[in-house]
């Protein structure tokens, strides 16, 4: 004889299903930082984009300093913000408040007006549109050294 299932077992089903997955609170702040399309700090850009992607041997490390640009922590900010581009003299590498006048953004987007190639040089993959927009948002906010 086959045992019969418990008569009230179906009452437990909604409780079990309710425990699956997580529900985010509507008051939980959205994520920020590289890859999210929101402005982030220069420290985040350095740590999550410049150091692992750009400050490599043969590129923008201190030994190579391609186009006179070093993107290593501690020196990159001073060589970017308000510093003239060596490839496009009428533009600064980063023009605070103006991503469309910042050569860095043009290079990251692969704009037709750039000299040379789109960055990073070993792309694709290049930076995501969200990462580029995050850097642009930082520039739009005045490119603070935070």
Predicted features along the sequence, with ranges:
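Solvent-exposed helix-loop boundary motif
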Residues: 21-38, 43-47, 51-129, 133
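Flexible coil segments in periplasmic/lumen-exposed cytochrome c-class electron-transfer proteins
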Residues: 129, 141-146
